[in-house]
């Protein structure tokens, strides 16, 4: 009797740990930042003027569901790299920032989207240091997978 009670408890415990989820339906794929079939903007080596606008335009895609995206712009006065582009742009001499442009914003993507076209006008402040900058896009899908795209741009 003791053996059957212990066996029953063990069987119940193991059953509670099992899952009916099908592992084949789990999202295991990174989202994509696409520039094909649109006029993607910005792209590597583009030059912008202080006081102008960067017309951001990219397509995001995921096999299951998109989540959100982030745009970050920061100076590259020290010539660091993020390693997502093979394009080399002409760079100014290294320098110390005085009034660098720092932009970092999160954007929601409506629920249930597998493809989304992101278009935003980003105003460049008139009082920022001119020079080399990185424009970074971080795209996250609903499962938490993230894709990064970094481009070198210049502000004059």
Descriptions of predicted regions:
Residues 114, 126-131:
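Surface-exposed, short loops/turns at beta-strand junctions within beta-sandwich domains
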Residues 137-139:
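Conserved structural position at the C-terminal beta-strand
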Residues 46, 54-65, 75-77, 141:
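Extracellular acidic, Ser/Thr/Pro-rich low-complexity tracts
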Residues 148-156:
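C-terminal edge beta-strand
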